[in-house]
C-alpha cells in the first residue's frame, strides 16, 4: 500500500513509473518498484548506502534506465545475475529455540534477502562474515509473530566487544568484529 499523499505526488511527478508492469517472477508491480530494486543492487554489491545515490546522480532521466537504454542498466543486470546465484546458495539453518540462525561467509550484502527467503514461521538471524575483520547480521520477524527484533538485538550490546546494533519490532541489524565470531 502506498500512502495516498505519496501516491498522488508520484503520479504527478512521474506517471509512467506508476504504471503496472510484470515482474520477473510473473507478479505485477509498478515500474518504479523495478527501478528502485535495480538501484538497490549497487548497495548489495558494494556495501555502501551511498552507492544508490551515486547511481541516481549518473542518470540524466529515469526513462533511459527504465527503458533499459542506459549503460548502467547492463552493469546492474550483471549484479542481478550474481545476486540471484548467491540468494540460492545452500545454507544450514540452525534452530535455537525461538530464533533460527544461518551463518554465511559472503562478500556481498545479502543477509536481509536470505532472512526473507528462509523465514519459516519464526524469527531468523543471518550472520555474514563478509571479510576477515567484520561480521554483519540481519534479523527478520514474521508479521504474525510477537517478537521485538530491536529489543532482542539490544540484549547483546555490551556483551560482545565492538558490537553495534538495533532495530524495531520486525527487523534489526548488528555488526561486530570477526574475531568475536565463533
Where would I find each of the regions flagged by the language model?
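A structured phosphate/pyrophosphate-recognition subdomain
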Residues: 1-98, 103-109, 115-130
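Glycine-rich, acidic loop segments that terminate in or are immediately followed by a histidine
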Residues: 4-9, 97-182
Amino acid at each position: 500500500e502506498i500512502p495516498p499523499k505519496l501516491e498522488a505526488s508520484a503520479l504527478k511527478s512521474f506517471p509512467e513509473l506508476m504504471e503496472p508492469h510484470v515482474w520477473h517472477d510473473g507478479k505485477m508491480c509498478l515500474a518504479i518498484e523495478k527501478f528502485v530494486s535495480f538501484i538497490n543492487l549497487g548497495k548489495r554489491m558494494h556495501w555502501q548506502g551511498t552507492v544508490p545515490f551515486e547511481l541516481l546522480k549518473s542518470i540524466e532521466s529515469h526513462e533511459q534506465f527504465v527503458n533499459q537504454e542506459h549503460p548502467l542498466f547492463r552493469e546492474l543486470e550483471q549484479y542481478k545475475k550474481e545476486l540471484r546465484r548467491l540468494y540460492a546458495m545452500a545454507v544450514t539453518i540452525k534452530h535455537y529455540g525461538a530464533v533460527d540462525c544461518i551463518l554465511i561467509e559472503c562478500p556481498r550484502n545479502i543477509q536481509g534477502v536470505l532472512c526473507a527467503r528462509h523465514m519459516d514461521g519464526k524469527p531468523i538471524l543471518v550472520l555474514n562474515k563478509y571479510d576477515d575483520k567484520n561480521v554483519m547480521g540481519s534479523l527478520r520477524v514474521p508479521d504474525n509473530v510477537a517478537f521485538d527484533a530491536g529489543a532482542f538485538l539490544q540484549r547483546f550490546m555490551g556483551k560482545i566487544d565492538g558490537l553495534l546494533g538495533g532495530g524495531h519490532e520486525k527487523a534489526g541489524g548488528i555488526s561486530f568484529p570477526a574475531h568475536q565470531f565463533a
